[in-house]
A protein has these predicted regions:
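Glyoxalase I/VOC metalloenzyme domain signal
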Residues: 55, 64, 293, 310-360, ...
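Acidic/histidine-rich catalytic cores of soluble enzymes
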Residues: 69-70, 160-258
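Alpha-helix-loop-beta-strand connector modules within alpha/beta enzyme cores
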Residues: 87-104, 155-167, 193-198, 259-264
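N-terminal pre-domain/capping segments
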Residues: 28-134, 296-326
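Active-site acidic/histidine proton-transfer and metal-coordination neighborhood
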Residues: 11, 15-22, 30, 37-40, ...
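Acidic-and-aromatic substrate-binding clefts and catalytic sites of carbohydrate-active enzymes
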Residues: 49-56, 73-84, 106-116, 144-149, ...
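Hydrophobic faces of well-ordered beta-strands that scaffold small-molecule active sites
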Residues: 42-48, 70-72, 98-103, 137-139, ...
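A structural motif
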Residues: 67, 129-134, 228, 273-274, ...
């Protein structure tokens, strides 16, 4: 908001009447991105400490992402090279309001002379707030050694502070820090507020401070909504460490971590609270990342969170976005490669070896359909358009993935409302325009459903190849999973992207040991197992994943896994067609037999076809890989038995070592001599 007593600033006009910098309004209301549309309902905010950049860069990113306002963290104000009144004007110029000033530390329970000094400090903060146009200050519970305990003592302090603040048009919000010296629980903070009994004193709730201490969020439901002045939200991975260090370095956006933030927010909503929702995120990666991307992720997380709350607490007063539900996904309809005419011949030859049949040709484009059972691989050799641009950037690579969903139109609408970039690609007369959004590495994710003409894709857009015949191939049935590679710092972004748009969950992250360093891996999957995507985060280019990113200039899909019903029959059929499996060392099979107590005949069979093996309490897993190709993409064939739900993570270090040997041109020779 503008400073108190000053005329309201026009969003697109600066204080001196000049047109505001275009960056302040860039993206608003454009491009089908609903996150940039201002809402008159749900009020959203983010603390300036949550993202990187100087103050102006932060405001530009926050405004562009579609927030209503900000929390000004004192450090950002102190570092700003202008007066408090200039802060107010600058925030207003970006179409934002200052919803909170924080933090005011070490206040309650102090003996004299510290108590008087604390009130003097508060008066000076009130001066700043009046100048910048902010009417709510966050007071966090005292951690000072001099602080004295006692609810009544603290309540008396807040009653006096509320009286002083009220005369200045300011409200005081009390927050219990999880590591507070005497008050570290929102229930105690509420009791202080209740006993203070002042209209200008209320409670501030922070999901991290409650959930990190395993405090039942249902205890919030008994607090009157009008006495909750502000709500801060943060998630975090479950880590056993010091609360302060955990909070200051590992918070993340709601939905990116492991805390029950939805349960917390349901309890808040049940109180009748209808004020702002704000993100207060301390995260080392975020503070070194792109302000625009982090702000966008935050807004997406708030919209997705409130949609979850609305569906489980339908009678809440707090405004919530009205968006379609998360999409139910029935698997991968097709994977499209972009390539050149020359490299297409190599790719087509390899698919033929793997048992795929050239089944169709696009009616107007240079796109060939290769099929095996429910797997469709497209090879695009167009010399213009999106696919060609992707080829020029990444080389032969996956440019498109199409997913089968329950309702394509609703999926696109939900994605749009959550800030995904929707894309419309040209279609010829009578051809289908398949709805799409931009995904990892700039690739397309398209959506196809059974309730529209999209279900007739192969009939409408493709001409069958004469004599294509049987497409059963070597027994590859469907796409088991897609492995997407990215920089490690992007993993939270794409985790939230998938889990907020599609009805999927995230599997705990695992560390994959590569001779060149660690790769972090996390699977995104739905309950049926029909959609599985593994996200692999590379921290340097010495790992196989990092090498892929470097060589392909950021392409996403590094490998595709196909499911079969009989791993040995498929492996034998592939070997007969000239397929070269990635050879594993004899040491791997010796260790495998010792680990699982496998008999020699079974081990010999595995080694013959270079098949890797894993098992857990649920079932068994078989996998083998193609050797490296010039495109940097490789293929995996898997079989899951008896409910095995993993990805053979224990085998990953040995597979990567074998691939690096192959990459360097010195592969082991499989037992078959291939």
């Amino acid at each position: 908001m503008p400073p108190r007593g000053a005329p309201r600033s026009c969003r697109n006009e600066s204080r001196d009447g000049r047109a505001a910098d275009d960056s302040r309004t860039a993206g608003k209301g454009k491009g089908g991105n609903a996150m940039t549309d201002r809402s008159d309902t749900l009020r959203t905010s983010i603390a300036t400490v949550s993202i990187a950049g100087d103050f102006r860069e932060k405001l530009a990113a926050i405004s562009r992402a579609g927030y209503t306002g900000i929390e000004i963290f004192e450090q950002d104000f102190i570092a700003f090279d202008g007066a408090p009144v200039d802060v107010g004007w600058l925030v207003a110029d970006y179409g934002l309001e200052i919803m909170l000033f924080q933090p005011f530390r070490d206040f309650e329970g102090l003996p004299e002379p510290y108590r008087s000094r604390a009130f003097d400090r508060a008066e000076r903060k009130f001066d700043l707030m009046n100048s910048m146009g902010c009417d709510l200050v966050l007071v966090c519970s005292n951690i000072a050694a001099a602080a004295l305990g006692g609810i009544d003592r603290a309540a008396d302090d807040f009653a006096e502070l509320g009286e002083r603040a009220g005369k200045r048009g300011i409200r005081v919000g009390f927050e219990a820090l999880a590591w507070g010296r005497h008050i570290n629980d929102h229930r105690d903070a509420w009791e202080v507020v209740r006993r203070a009994d002042h209209s200008h004193v209320g409670l501030i709730l922070d999901s991290f401070h409650t959930l990190s201490r395993d405090i039942d969020p249902q205890t919030i439901r008994s607090i009157p909504g009008d006495k909750i002045f502000f709500v801060q939200l943060a998630d975090a991975p479950k880590i056993d460490m010091d609360l302060f260090y955990w909070s200051r370095h590992f918070r993340n956006m709601p939905g990116e971590g492991d805390l029950p933030v939805v349960d917390f927010m349901r309890a808040v909503a049940a109180t009748g609270y209808d004020g702002p929702l704000s993100l207060e995120i301390f995260n080392d990666q975020f503070r070194a990342g792109s302000p625009v991307e982090i702000a966008r992720d935050g807004h997406r997380s708030l919209m997705g969170l409130m949609d979850d709350v609305r569906r489980s607490e339908p009678d809440i007063r707090l405004p919530a976005p009205d968006m379609p539900p998360r999409a139910q996904c029935g698997g991968v309809e097709f994977v499209e490669f972009t390539t050149s005419e020359e490299e297409a011949a190599e790719l087509a030859g390899f698919l033929s070896v793997m048992g795929f049949t050239h089944a169709g040709t696009h009616v107007s484009k240079q796109v060939a359909q290769w099929r095996q059972n429910d797997i469709n691989i497209l090879i695009n050799t167009e010399e213009s358009g999106f696919a060609h641009s992707a080829y020029q950037t990444h080389g032969t690579s996956v440019c498109d993935i199409a997913l089968r969903v329950d309702d394509a139109a609703q999926t696109i609408e939900r994605a749009r409302m959550l800030g995904a970039e929707t894309v419309t690609t040209p279609a010829g007369e009578g051809e289908l325009s398949i709805p799409a959004i931009r995904g990892v590495g700039g690739g397309m994710i398209r959506f196809i459903d059974a309730g529209s003409d999209l279900a007739r894709l192969w009939e409408i857009d493709f001409v069958p190849v004469a004599g294509a015949g049987d497409v059963s191939g070597v027994g590859l049935r469907r796409v088991d999973h897609l492995a997407q590679t990215m920089k490690y710092e992007e993993m939270l972004t794409w985790t939230l992207f998938y889990t907020s748009i599609l009805d999927t969950g995230k599997v705990p992250m695992v560390d994959v040991v590569d001779p060149g360093g660690l790769v972090r891996s996390r699977a995104i999957q739905n309950d049926s197992g029909e959609l599985r995507v593994t996200l692999n985060g590379a921290e340097n280019q010495n790992t196989l994943a990092g090498h892929f990113i470097d060589r392909t200039f950021g392409a996403a899909v590094q490998h595709i896994a196909f499911a079969c019903d009989d791993i040995f029959a498929t492996a034998e059929a592939l070997a007969a067609r000239g397929f070269e499996a990635l050879a594993m060392s004899a040491n791997y099979y010796d260790d495998l037999g010792a680990r699982f107590g496998l008999d020699e005949a079974f081990l010999s069979r595995l080694q013959t076809f270079s098949i890797l093996y894993d098992e857990d309490a649920q079932g068994r897993f078989f996998q083998f890989y193609s050797r490296r190709r010039s495109s940097e993409i490789f293929f995996e064939i898997v079989q899951r038995l008896d409910g095995y739900d993993g990805y053979g993570a224990a085998n990953a270090p040995f597979r990567i070592s074998a691939q690096k040997r192959d990459l360097n041109g010195s592969p082991f020779t499989a037992a078959t001599g291939n």
